[in-house]
Swiss-Prot record:
This is tRNA/tmRNA (uracil-C(5))-methyltransferase. The lineage of its organism: Bacteria, Pseudomonadati, Pseudomonadota, Gammaproteobacteria, Aeromonadales. S-adenosyl-L-methionine binds at residues 199, 227, 232, 248, 308. The keyword Nucleotidyltransferase does not apply. The gene is trmA. It comes from Aeromonas salmonicida (strain A449). GO terms for cellular component: cytosol. Pfam families: tRNA_U5-meth_tr (PF05958). It catalyses: uridine(54) in tRNA + S-adenosyl-L-methionine = 5-methyluridine(54) in tRNA + S-adenosyl-L-homocysteine + H(+); uridine(341) in tmRNA + S-adenosyl-L-methionine = 5-methyluridine(341) in tmRNA + S-adenosyl-L-homocysteine + H(+). GO terms for biological process: tRNA methylation. The active site is at residues 333, 367.
Length: 377
């Protein structure tokens, strides 16, 4: 094993604010060049905190006798690197890491065949820890885990512990946390469920939501969002529109979105559990769905659509669907696929706003946002 104490901390100790700005400037130049052919306006650049910006982290666990450590695999060499501190992750995760290991070490039943620990933290102070095992978890494990959770809570951690094994999930309390985001002077509440997608960089998420609010301010008509997840964007944007329709297919995400709608007092947003293809058929009157009983689609005038697709971007059919709307708000975690989609969308729409969000500092990855308006004539 490659014993690199505080691997993350040592590598970041040499980084300066100038180093952060240099990597951000390189991304600015790269994104500007990538979209030069679409004649966008000046790029709006949103910087991230240089450390403690990632709200979730996953670590493999390395065992040496009765001891155990967090570790990661070096991408280039596949070496196992011991991680005692991880400045990329939130301060809360870093505070909990050594305390959690200290609580695990004395208990063989908690250590045995433990191979991974996942953390999901929040700015609100709540955190979920998932312990992953290569064995079935018995009553003895649950009893020891409940004691560990109580000990950690007594030390001041607002923690929920979860045990996972093959076809097994044991929750010692809730399997979600409640996050608080400050967006354009307003506090928004979001339920985030363990093992479901959430935006990894809370500070950048707040900036993305604020930017999306700004670019859609003064919008007329209604908003449609495809695959809304837990309602992260729809809930923030609802104040700018008469009504909002959002689609999502994953039931846990739909349930979280419904919770978040109520928690934030939003009264003009409806979540539909259906795919983009099904929604398109329903809007065009090609098929009826029982799930739409009580929803009058004809009362909606959705002239703005919001999409935040996975790294693969939008498929051809969805690009054509999106192209039917006058205003398109597109957040992309892969500017290369956004550029490919823009080759089609750019035939009918022009870029009105253009943004870079440094969601993943110190990596080559970029998050981009474009607000497109239909060309005149």
């Amino acid at each position: 094993m490659t014993q690199i104490q505080q691997a993350g901390a040592d590598s970041q100790a040499l980084r300066t604010p100038a180093d952060y700005q240099a990597q951000l400037d390189e991304k600015r130049e790269r994104l500007t060049q990538l979209f030069a052919g679409f004649n966008p306006p000046a790029l709006e650049v949103h910087a991230s905190p240089a450390e403690h910006y990632r709200m979730r982290a996953e670590f493999r666990i390395w065992h040496e006798g009765d001891d155990l450590f967090h570790c990661m695999y070096a991408q280039a060499t596949k070496e196992i690197i011991r991680v005692d501190h991880f400045p990329t992750a939130s301060l809360l995760i870093n505070q909990l890491m050594p305390v959690l290991l200290a609580g695990l070490r004395p208990h063989f039943v908690l250590r045995r065949k433990l191979f991974q620990i996942d953390y999901l933290s929040t700015q609100s102070g709540q955190i979920i820890v998932s312990l992953l095992y290569h064995r079935k978890l018995e009553a003895e494990w649950q009893q020891a885990a409940e004691t560990l959770q109580a000990d950690l809570q007594a030390q001041g951690f607002d923690l929920r512990l979860i045990g996972r094994a093959h076809k097994q999930k044991i929750c010692l309390g809730d399997d979600f946390v409640i996050e608080q985001l400050n967006v354009a002077g307003r506090q928004l509440t979001y339920k985030q469920v363990e093992n479901s997608f959430t935006q990894p960089n809370a500070a950048i998420n707040e900036q993305m939501l604020g930017w999306a609010l700004d670019v859609t301010r003064g919008s007329e008509g209604d908003l449609l969002e495809l695959y809304c997840g837990n309602g992260n964007f729809s809930i923030a944007l609802a104040q700018n529109f008469r009504k909002v329709l959002a689609t999502e297919i994953a039931k846990p995400s739909v349930d979280s979105a419904q919770f978040n709608i109520a928690a934030n007092g939003v009264d003009n947003l409806i979540i539909l559990r259906m795919s983009a293809e099904e929604f398109t058929m329903a809007m065009r009157g090609e098929r009826e769905f029982n799930r739409l009983k009580g929803v009058d689609l004809k009362s909606y005038q959705c002239n703005t659509i919001f999409v935040d697709p996975p790294r693969a971007g939008l498929d051809d059919a969805t690009v054509k669907l999106v192209q039917e709307y006058d205003n398109i708000l597109y957040i992309s975690c892969n500017p290369e696929t956004l550029q490919a989609n823009m080759a089609v969308l750019g035939e009918t729409h022009e870029v009105a706003r253009f943004a870079l969000f440094d969601q993943f500092p110190w990596t080559h990855h970029m998050e981009a946002g474009v607000y497109l308006k239909r060309k005149a004539g």
